[in-house]
Amino acid sequence: MSRLLHAEEWAEVKELGDHHRQPQPHHLPQPPPPPPPQPPATLQAREHPVYPPELSLLDSTDPRAWLAPTLQGICTARAAQYLLHSPELSASEAAAPRDEVDGRGELVRRSSGGASSSKSPGPVKVREQLCKLKGGVVVDELGCSRQRAPSSKQVNGVQKQRRLAANARERRRMHGLNHAFDQLRNVIPSFNNDKKLSKYETLQMAQIYINALSELLQTPSGGEQPPPPPASCKSDHHHLRTAASYEGGAGNATAAGAQQASGGSQRPTPPGSCRTRFSAPASAGGYSVQLDALHFSTFEDSALTAMMAQKNLSPSLPGSILQPVQEENSKTSPRSHRSDGEFSPHSHYSDSDEAS
């Protein structure tokens, strides 16, 4: 009997075990799920119908859930649309929001579909895409738009303008210089009218012409023309003499030479020194005369041409028109020729002039 009861009890226990084994998974204690991330207050107030509850299914460890609070400053609705249509979501999770999104969501899906990859894009790329979709709105806080450096075209334009301005200034300067040389060529005489003088030749001819005019003004009208000075005294020709003294009376050149030889009041001139034509002191019978350009009568062109013809070099040397004739007995200083045809500033002066 006891054995039969034991079998009946075993059957009851077995039935109870089968009965309790089926609902057993429903009664097991389960850990509470982590609280879903709460959407921002601005999102609940403004874009609540566009922000579906599918975002609550995201785990707190999912990096896509971290992007939502980062993007709440620009456009939260677009951030939600980007998260819902990211390639990480499965087809079942993304089916409902695809039906609810509007035309803006379609643009987001088209732009994100071309740039989809195995990894979800970082917050910087998401920020740039959302800023582009907002229609060019500038957000200075997030740095979506940056000030662009001046392009190479603008820099090249500025450099071209400066170069053109410098070229124009140099062109005006050369035109003014050429005009001044043309005016100088018109006033100086030229023996070869067919050939246009160069700038260097024009300056040399102007120097010869000025020296000839100064000698003509310094020559007395009734007296004998004194001999020309040596080349070392050419610096004296550049200054006009305002006063000159000469001896009067009926004395001739022989008497004057005898007076200079016998008289002890005058100091003899050394052979190497520079003698001027009118530097001798006036004698007892002499008197000084103030020379003025207005007191002289106008000279003829033939006299000036003959005077300048005496200053030309021999035809065998090049540039004979430019250089005056040098006396054989005069002491000349060597000229330092340069490669460009110019002379040094002290080429026309001797060492004795520089020392004095």
Curated annotation (Swiss-Prot):
Gene name as annotated: ATOH1
**Positions in coiled-coil regions:** none
This chain belongs to the protein called Transcription factor ATOH1
Is-annotated flag, keyword Iron-sulfur? no
GO CC terms, sorted:
nucleus
* SUPFAM superfamilies xref list: HLH, helix-loop-helix DNA-binding domain (SSF47459)
UniProt GO MF annotations: chromatin DNA binding; DNA-binding transcription activator activity, RNA polymerase II-specific; DNA-binding transcription factor activity, RNA polymerase II-specific; E-box binding; protein dimerization activity
Which regions are flagged for Low complexity bias?
Answer: 110-124, 252-266
Q: How does it assemble?
A: Efficient DNA binding requires dimerization with another bHLH protein.
Per the UniProt record, the source organism is: Pan troglodytes
